[in-house]
Curated annotation (Swiss-Prot):
Protein name in UniProt: N-acetylmuramic acid 6-phosphate etherase
GN (gene name): murQ
SUBUNIT field: Homodimer.
UniProt-listed PROSITE patterns: GCKR, SIS
EC number: 4.2.1.126
Domain SIS: 56-219
Keyword terms of this UniProt record: Carbohydrate metabolism, Lyase
Gene3D superfamilies, A to Z: 1.10.8.1080, Glucose-6-phosphate isomerase like protein, domain 1
Origin species: Lactococcus lactis subsp. cremoris (strain SK11)
């Protein structure tokens, strides 16, 4: 039998014992007060997040991937963060990957027993052709999900880097990772509902890992997402605005270079900043490893 009594995420919150008796306003205030604790809890583990980001940058530079593994809410958050990297940073969907126990179906409905399988976590990475250049980040609020542990153990066999993210101290998955992150947000507002504070903490940390690792491989210039992919009308206009912000050019100039660059925002910026044609701009970016700033030297 699994003993959940030692897990912070399963403890009852002293502040919400009478939750069912609260008015809507009282419950809102209590919930908001609990949520305020999350960012401070994340702040405590920044030193543990830093090496994970460094490892992700190293993986990308070797042609490897960042692979999120989780079940339930943890898995869904990984899939969400991975999916957002494609339009935001212009990376292929294969570079940041989110895997959830039970597969795509588990994004919307619970898949019975999927998270309890060590073998399933292993098999999902085999199917992904895991390599030693990859970084596997196992996510589990409880810190004990077998699916995640199976994945981390297989990653060790292959020689891939291993990180973990849990919301309990002394988590089991931490023993299976080189770079463990244990963020303690205290008991949930609703006992055991880890989609709340734990999920929020996980989302904040995944945001940090994906965003800052992308900065580390040249996907950002100043604080602008210069590799954004203009896949809809809103993003086309945002792309032109980014070009204007990066170069202090007019809308008309931004639009002209955007089109000359075949809607490549980063290339258009380099063309404007260095006064060059598209082909020369491409060469400059290759030599600069994709960093806009390095094309200006």
């Amino acid at each position: 039998m699994i003993d959940l009594s030692t897990l912070t995420t399963e403890r009852r919150n002293d502040e919400t014992f009478n939750l069912d008796q609260m008015t809507v306003k009282e419950a809102l205030v209590k919930m908001n007060n609990e949520d305020k604790k999350v960012a401070y809890a994340v702040e405590e583990v920044l030193p543990n997040i830093e090496p994970v980001i460094s490892s992700a940058i190293e993986a990308f530079n070797k042609g490897g991937r960042l692979i999120y593994m989780g079940a339930g809410t943890s898995g869904r958050l990984g899939v969400l963060d991975a999916a957002e990297c494609v339009p935001t940073f212009g990376v292929p969907a294969t570079q940041v990957v989110g895997l959830i126990a039970g597969g795509d179906k588990a994004m919307t409905v619970a898949v019975e027993g999927a998270e309890d399988s060590l073998e399933l976590g292993r098999q999902d990475l085999i199917d992904l052709n895991l390599s030693e250049n990859d970084l596997v980040l196992g996510i589990a609020a409880s810190g004990r999900t077998p699916y995640v542990i199976g994945a981390l153990d297989y990653a060790k066999e292959i020689g891939a880097k291993r990180a973990s993210l849990s919301c309990n101290l002394n988590a089991e998955i931490s023993k299976h990772a080189e770079f463990p992150i244990e963020v303690d947000c205290g008991p949930e507002f609703l006992t055991g509902s880890t989609r709340l504070k734990s999920g929020t903490a996980q989302k904040l940390i995944l945001n940090m890992i994906s965003t800052i690792s992308m900065i580390g491989i040249g996907k950002v210039y100043n604080n602008l997402m210069v590799d954004v992919k203009p896949t809809n009308e809103k993003l086309v206009e945002r792309s032109k605005r980014i070009i204007m912000q990066a170069t202090d050019c007019t809308y008309e100039e931004a639009e002209e270079k955007f089109n000359e660059a075949n809607q490549d925002v980063k290339l258009a910026i380099v063309m404007l900043l260095t006064d060059c044609a598209a082909e020369e701009g491409k060469t400059k970016l290759v030599k600069a490893n994709g960093f806009v700033k390095n094309t200006l030297n």
